[in-house]
């Protein structure tokens, strides 16, 4: 039974080990602590999986005191990791029990794998002893947890706890815990041979993402030593690898993440591929080694039975398939053995390391992929492409930076004005969605929007039709669906207009569909299509996310998609649509899978999920998506299908006998930033050019990657220029304009005529000093976050910047000629309300001279490259300074969730009182600074206008004598920062700052302390109010307007009553 939840997220250090904290840790100890810290995040994620997917009893709860429910992607990824390790151990234990078995978990962390297996199947474990091995420090903590967990000791039976100085910390009949650094192999070997292992035994080594944190030499030593510990040894290692090189967007994001954590991956560089990993083991004394990606294992019915895969969807709705595949394709499970004659399955090189360039016909030298990444670009994925006319297209809805969006990003090639409101869906009418389709059905650009979803459990049934540039609701689908596929077809003699054929998809309850429907522009709505297959073959399996394309008006092809069992289907069909004599619709399908396999080299990279298909004069261009068993390789990202040959086979009822598949890839000479063609859209902008837009993915827990810019595929011989660029984001936002138009003219005039007169307050010196603390662990800082009170963290290591960043050093390092934008104030107090300052562009050297001479100037750095789009980032904007500044390890949550890190340099000038929605830490580097802070509860008394975040009050109106404004009903707090201090400012605490002497230099790091709820869209400064407040203000406008039909006194009466009710609710 699990203990009650505690405030801490993961285990705190044992008391016996806390004394070690007072000593200054060595470099190796710091490195070990960073590696052990990765275990904390891992077990929290595994606990999330356990809560949802595992039956009672639960075991991670004894090590994770405060559970968190992770996102479905994280849950499924960790479920697969856990299943891979558990299944590997089960297979080992099922082998003939002619000798004792030992499972040695190298770098076990707090993973309770032995307890899970012993509890689930005691008889299977009867001949097995589990041995957990990790750092001494970690195993002391694990021992302390077991002492307190009666449920765990009852499973082990006859548990003995060793003294802290002993290598064997815990011993029972089937479980041993050993504290030993894996780099100390002499000690580990001695302990295992003398105290744990008998002379004859079978040993299975486990290493789940543990050896990769060691330097390569030390990790290789472990692999080699393990092969000699027993004459009957096996090794199962689960780690990251580069299936398509380190430049793949997922790989690059993953590596950057671990680098930021201070726990970089090492072995991956020495052994990047599966074949390299197999060689690593065979050269270290292992007789056989076989590696497979987790994505490959996911599709293996023997390793993950189909019934088990499908059961996961009944527990938690899931639709992050592309992102799951990317994760699973970058992790491998390798099984090695010292037994002679061990048989492995097909080598890794044959299943996952061979790129299509060695298998399929390539035409990469015939095409160019031209990026345009220099101009602003939208960020959305899983939207739908909307044709907008000549040289104009849009991406409608989909997933934006933080949530679903209902508007349209518009792209064009010229600077001509466009009537976006007429051509693109209105966010006022059509709700936000993703995984929907928009299909043109006429030469005039008329199109049909179909279905989609909000969440995977909420499919949409509506349709919308654009005719003559007007969008109107259409006939609802017979059944709501998303991830369906759609294409234009034309039946009858009128070729200028047509119909839309849709197939497959998924419903709200998770049912995968196999139905064909036809929508016709004749007012009749949807018609079902009867399916007939040639040669009495079975009909295609139900699927979603498939590729459906027309070759001409009534013939086309279908392939790929994911079936009901959660794997990508590897079939290929051609189809012919026709009308029977009675007017009914019929679809004739031919299974071309067998013939295509026989003639098409590289067929394994053709089955796709989430790919796009565009028709060109060259053939059908297939781009992106995911494929079975491995990641889509660089030279297989874009494929070309011979549509002429396909059409000839369909019309003549013949099987395929000549190759139709060739690869284009990302261009043989391509050297730019690689796009991630997932969740993207594509469009044939001419007969031989295809434009790729949008896309990106959540790269597991490592961060989000967005494909930047526009990408145009064209033949090599063309003199093409990619000048497609984003016109504007969120083109459909008329709500504010309409609201403004509805304000009476008199009200506008009255508001404009008001003159701001600052109120004079009495003075006071009574302030509450902010507490000073030292923070030595992440747990201590987490407690500070939970307390939500400002503190000054002193004696922290923020790098050599506190000594180095003199005026001369900064000018020389940043560059005297570097252009910066500064606030130049008219007085010593800047006011955001009266704007008594101006923005000036000048060189950094000039600014530093002037500010050190007493100039009333203030620099708050902004993004150097895209100041209107990206938040400030010290490392990116001032790379020459980045190595001088760092946050202490205890504040790693700030680093992991950082939003921005502006550099602040100020002279004798005071910033206005304001609040920030995000939490932040202000690191004082040079000079001293005085800040006055007010708790969020004081905001009604601080003259902060509705919808604004800045106050109109000058708190330092009597700064000369150290007094501040005496504002009734407020509780001012004071922070006096000196060099090296870190001030933690919780969200919504209003604050203002003034230097107390010479020039002040500081770095602010804003970070997200909420998992959701921030404002939608761009937030460069991190101070936009939360989404609920912004929406609430809009709702308030509607509420006030609803009383417009009443006499003013009655409206006021009821509005005040509502205000009282709202205040009562807020104060509960």
Curated annotation (Swiss-Prot):
Gene Ontology annotations of biological process type: tRNA methylation; wybutosine biosynthetic process
Annotated stretches, region: Disordered: 1-31
Pfam families per record: Cupin_8, Kelch_3, LCM
Reactions it catalyzes: 7-[(3S)-3-amino-3-carboxypropyl]wyosine(37) in tRNA(Phe) + S-adenosyl-L-methionine = 7-[(3S)-(3-amino-3-methoxycarbonyl)propyl]wyosine(37) in tRNA(Phe) + S-adenosyl-L-homocysteine; 7-[(3S)-(3-amino-3-methoxycarbonyl)propyl]wyosine(37) in tRNA(Phe) + S-adenosyl-L-methionine + CO2 = wybutosine(37) in tRNA(Phe) + S-adenosyl-L-homocysteine + 2 H(+)
A GO molecular-function descriptor: tRNA methyltransferase activity
Pathway: tRNA modification; wybutosine-tRNA(Phe) biosynthesis
Sequence positions that bind S-adenosyl-L-methionine: 81, 107, 134, 181-182, 208
Keyword Lyase on entry: no
EC number: 2.1.1.290, 2.3.1.231
Record key words, sorted: Methyltransferase, S-adenosyl-L-methionine, Transferase, tRNA processing
S-adenosyl-L-methionine keyword on record: yes
Xref: InterPro entries: Cupin_8, JmjC_dom, Kelch-typ_b-propeller, Ppm1/Ppm2/Tcmp, SAM-dependent_MTases_sf
Every JmjC domain range: 876-1024
Family, as annotated: Belongs to the methyltransferase superfamily. LCMT family.
Record function comment: Probable S-adenosyl-L-methionine-dependent methyltransferase that acts as a component of the wybutosine biosynthesis pathway. Wybutosine is a hyper modified guanosine with a tricyclic base found at the 3'-position adjacent to the anticodon of eukaryotic phenylalanine tRNA. May methylate the carboxyl group of leucine residues to form alpha-leucine ester residues.
Annotated protein name in UniProt: tRNA wybutosine-synthesizing protein 4
Organism, as annotated: Emericella nidulans (strain FGSC A4 / ATCC 38163 / CBS 112.46 / NRRL 194 / M139) (Aspergillus nidulans)
Organism taxonomic ancestry: Eukaryota, Fungi, Dikarya, Ascomycota, Pezizomycotina
Gene: ppm2
């Amino acid at each position: 039974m699990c203990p009650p939840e505690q405030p801490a997220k993961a285990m705190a250090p044992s008391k016996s080990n806390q004394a070690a904290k007072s000593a200054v840790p060595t470099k190796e100890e710091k490195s070990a602590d960073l590696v052990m810290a990765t275990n904390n995040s891992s077990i929290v994620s595994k606990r999330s999986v356990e809560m949802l997917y595992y039956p009672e009893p639960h075991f991670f709860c004894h090590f994770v005191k405060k559970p968190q429910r992770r996102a479905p992607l994280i849950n499924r990824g960790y479920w697969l990791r856990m299943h891979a390790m558990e299944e590997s151990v089960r297979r080992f234990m099922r082998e003939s029990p002619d000798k004792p078995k030992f499972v040695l978990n190298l770098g076990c962390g707090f993973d309770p794998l032995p307890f899970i297996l012993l509890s689930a199947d005691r008889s299977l474990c009867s001949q097995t002893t589990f041995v957990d091995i990790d750092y001494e420090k970690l195993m002391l903590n694990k021992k302390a947890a077991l002492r307190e967990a009666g449920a765990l000791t009852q499973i082990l039976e006859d548990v003995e706890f060793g003294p802290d100085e002993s290598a064997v910390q815990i011993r029972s009949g089937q479980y041993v815990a050993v504290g030993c650094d894996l780099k100390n192999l002499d000690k580990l070997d001695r302990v295992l041979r003398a105290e744990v292992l008998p002379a004859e035994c079978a040993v299975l080594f486990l290493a789940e993402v543990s050896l990769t944190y060691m330097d390569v030499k030390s990790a290789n030593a472990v692999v080699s030593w393990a092969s000699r510990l027993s004459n009957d040894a096996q090794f199962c290692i689960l780690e990251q690898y580069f299936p398509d090189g380190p430049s793949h967007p997922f790989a690059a994001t993953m590596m950057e993440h671990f680098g930021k954590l201070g726990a970089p991956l090492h072995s991956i560089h020495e052994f990047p591929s599966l074949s390299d990993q197999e060689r690593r083991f065979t050269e270290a004394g292992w007789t056989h080694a076989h590696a497979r990606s987790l994505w490959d294992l996911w599709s293996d019915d023997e390793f993950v039975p189909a019934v088990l895969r499908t059961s996961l969807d009944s527990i938690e709705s899931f639709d992050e398939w592309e992102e799951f595949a990317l994760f699973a394709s970058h992790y491998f499970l390798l099984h090695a053995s010292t037994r002679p004659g061990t048989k492995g399955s097909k080598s890794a090189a044959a299943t996952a390391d061979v790129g299509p360039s060695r298998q399929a016909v390539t035409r990469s030298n015939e095409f160019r992929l031209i990026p345009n990444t220099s101009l602003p670009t939208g960020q959305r994925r899983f939207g739908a492409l909307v044709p907008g006319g000549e040289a104009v297209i849009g991406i409608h809805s989909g997933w934006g930076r933080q949530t679903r969006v209902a508007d349209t990003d518009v792209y064009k090639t010229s600077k001509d004005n466009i009537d976006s409101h007429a051509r693109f869906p209105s966010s006022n009418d059509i709700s936000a969605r993703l995984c929907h389709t928009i299909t043109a059905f006429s030469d005039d650009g008329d199109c049909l929007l179909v279905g989609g979803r909000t969440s995977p459990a909420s499919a949409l049934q509506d349709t919308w039709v654009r005719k003559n540039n007007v969008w109107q609701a259409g006939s609802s689908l017979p059944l709501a669906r998303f991830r369906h596929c759609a294409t234009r077809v034309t039946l009858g003699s009128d070729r200028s207009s047509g119909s839309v054929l849709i197939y497959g998809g998924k419903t709200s309850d998770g049912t995968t569909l196999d139905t064909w429907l036809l929508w016709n522009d004749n007012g009749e709505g949807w018609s079902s299509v009867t399916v007939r297959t040639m040669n009495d073959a079975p009909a295609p399996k139900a699927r979603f996310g498939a590729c459906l394309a027309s070759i001409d008006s009534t013939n086309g092809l279908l392939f790929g998609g994911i079936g009901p069992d959660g794997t990508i289907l590897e079939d290929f069909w051609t189809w012919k649509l026709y009308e029977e004599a009675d007017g009914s619709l019929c679809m004739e399908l031919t299974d071309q899978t067998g013939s295509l396999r026989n003639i098409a080299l590289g067929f394994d990279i053709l089955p796709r999920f989430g790919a796009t298909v565009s028709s060109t004069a060259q053939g059908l261009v297939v781009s992106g998506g995911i494929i079975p068993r491995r990641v889509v390789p660089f030279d297989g990202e874009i494929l070309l299908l011979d549509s002429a040959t396909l059409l000839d086979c369909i019309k003549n009822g013949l099987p395929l006998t000549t190759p139709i598949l060739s690869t284009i890839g990302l261009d043989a000479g391509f050297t730019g930033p690689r796009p991630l063609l997932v969740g993207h859209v594509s469009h044939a902008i001419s007969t031989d050019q295809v434009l790729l837009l949008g896309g990106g993915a959540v790269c597991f827990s490592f961060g989000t990657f967005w494909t930047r810019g526009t990408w145009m595929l064209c033949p090599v011989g063309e003199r093409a220029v990619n000048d497609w660029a984003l016109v504007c984001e969120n083109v459909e936002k008329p709500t504010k304009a309409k609201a403004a138009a509805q304000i009476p003219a008199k009200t506008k005039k009255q508001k404009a005529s008001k003159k701001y007169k600052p109120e004079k307050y009495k003075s006071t010196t009574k302030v509450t000093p902010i507490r000073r603390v030292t923070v030595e662990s992440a747990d201590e800082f987490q407690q500070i976050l939970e307390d939500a009170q400002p503190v000054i963290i002193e004696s922290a290591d923020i790098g050599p910047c506190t000594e180095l960043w003199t005026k001369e050093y900064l000018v020389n390092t940043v560059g005297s000629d570097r252009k910066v934008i500064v606030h130049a104030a008219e007085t010593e107090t800047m006011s955001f309300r009266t704007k008594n300052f101006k923005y000036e562009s000048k060189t950094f050297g000039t600014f530093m001279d002037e500010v050190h001479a007493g100039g009333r100037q203030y620099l708050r750095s902004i993004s150097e490259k895209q100041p209107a789009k990206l938040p400030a980032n010290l490392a990116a904007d001032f790379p020459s300074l980045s190595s001088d500044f760092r946050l202490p390890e205890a504040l790693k949550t700030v680093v992991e969730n950082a939003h921005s890190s502006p550099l602040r340099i100020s002279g004798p000038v005071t910033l206005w009182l304001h609040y920030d929605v995000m939490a932040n830490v202000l690191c004082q580097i040079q000079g001293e600074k005085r800040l006055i802070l007010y708790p969020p509860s004081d905001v009604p008394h601080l003259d902060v206008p509705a919808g604004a975040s800045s106050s109109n009050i000058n708190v330092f109106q009597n700064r000369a004598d150290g007094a501040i404004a005496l504002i009734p009903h407020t509780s001012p707090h004071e922070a006096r920062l000196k060099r090296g201090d870190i001030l933690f400012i919780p969200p919504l605490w209003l604050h203002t700052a003034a230097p107390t002497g010479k020039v002040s230099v500081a770095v602010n790091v804003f970070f997200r302390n909420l998992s959701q709820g921030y404002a939608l869209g761009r937030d460069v400064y991190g101070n936009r109010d939360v989404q609920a407040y912004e929406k609430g203000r809009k709702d308030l406008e509607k509420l006030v307007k609803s009383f417009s039909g009443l006499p003013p006194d009655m409206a006021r009466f009821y509005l005040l009553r509502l205000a009282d009710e709202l205040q009562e609710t807020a104060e509960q």
